[in-house]
Regions:
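Membrane-proximal helix-turn-helix segments that form the acceptor-binding/catalytic region
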Residues: 17-36, 43
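A short, active-site helix/loop in glycosyltransferases that binds the activated sugar's phosphate group
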Residues: 33-56, 193
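Carbohydrate-associated surface elements
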Residues: 42, 60, 69
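Conserved donor-binding/catalytic core segment of Leloir-type glycosyltransferases
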Residues: 77-95, 100-104
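Nucleotide-activated donor-binding/catalytic signature segment of Leloir-type glycosyltransferases, i.e.
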Residues: 82, 116, 122-147
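Nucleotide-sugar-dependent
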Residues: 95, 143, 147-148, 155-177, ...
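Conserved acidic donor-binding segment of nucleotide-sugar-dependent glycosyltransferases
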Residues: 197-206, 213-220
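A charged, aromatic-enriched C-terminal amphipathic alpha-helix characteristic of glycosyltransferases
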Residues: 217-250
Length: 252
């Protein structure tokens, strides 16, 4: 395909693992690229045999949208009593819902929001839906998401089997940080949390539940400013400025 295109320079932006495709596809693209952007150190290391010109540009988030303090409480949340803990993202077939299911059953007085399209093939989805304190809701527009997250007491990050072994920080995390709310995430057995000073990292459903309890007991404003600052540093405008600087330095 590249042979059929006319271009002055070739840039490859690698933001995910493509191991499900023939490896020579990405290898040939990386070899041909004048400059490669990688979203994580792991991806950069993976691509390094094929390029000596790789720049690390992590994912980012829309900080201005998720950091606003004037967002309205969505109608479906008006009647909720008690703490609200929310997950933002698709409930895919390989999303591990076990930590959420365990915590929802342990705390029937808490509310859990799953904000995204739900795949019926997920093996725990029916059991999660059966919990009276869990709401699975597909949003009509992503523009609604900041309103929902603004009124969550804790933001939740769950694991997808396809991401096992990857070190890519999803944009979801930066959106969570931009709200300033406590964040509780599941971690793989050998995974190191990227933001250990502001995110609670769990390795089992039981520890996930305990850390949700700690997050809800967190003193207001304790580290919310630090979380927002991490979100601000990862704003897409900052990422774009860094890309522009790298391109200018490289002479593109």
């Amino acid at each position: 395909m590249l042979d059929a295109l006319s271009y002055g320079a070739l840039l490859y932006d690698c933001d995910r693992d493509w191991s499900q495709y023939p490896i020579h596809w990405e290898s040939e693209l990386t070899l041909a690229a004048d400059l490669v952007f990688a979203a994580s150190a792991g991806l950069a290391d993976h691509l390094s045999p094929c390029s000596g010109n790789i720049a690390l540009i992590p994912n980012g988030g829309n900080h201005p949208m998720f950091s606003r303090d004037d967002l309205s409480r969505p109608l479906p949340m008006l009647d909720l009593e008690g703490p609200v803990l929310g997950w933002a993202g698709a409930v895919s077939a390989d999303l591990d819902l076990a930590p959420l299911l365990y915590t929802a059953r342990a705390h029937p007085d808490w509310n859990f929001l799953l904000l995204g399209a739900a795949d019926p093939a997920n093996p725990l989805l029916d059991r999660v839906r059966a919990c009276p304190n869990v709401i699975v809701r597909q949003l009509d527009s992503l523009l609604e998401l900041p309103d929902y997250l603004a009124w969550c007491d804790v933001c939740l990050n769950l694991l997808r089997e396809r991401d096992n072994g990857l070190d890519i920080v999803p944009s979801r995390i930066y959106e969570y940080l931009s709200t300033g709310h406590p964040v509780v995430t599941m971690l793989w057995p050998d995974q190191v949390e990227h933001f250990p000073d502001v995110i609670y990292g769990a390795h089992s459903p039981e520890s996930f539940c305990r850390l949700c309890e700690q997050a809800l007991a967190e003193a207001p404003g304790w580290v919310s400013g630090r979380r927002r600052n991490y979100g601000r540093q990862a704003a897409w405008s900052h990422r774009a400025a860094e890309v522009d600087r790298i391109l200018s330095t490289a002479g593109f």
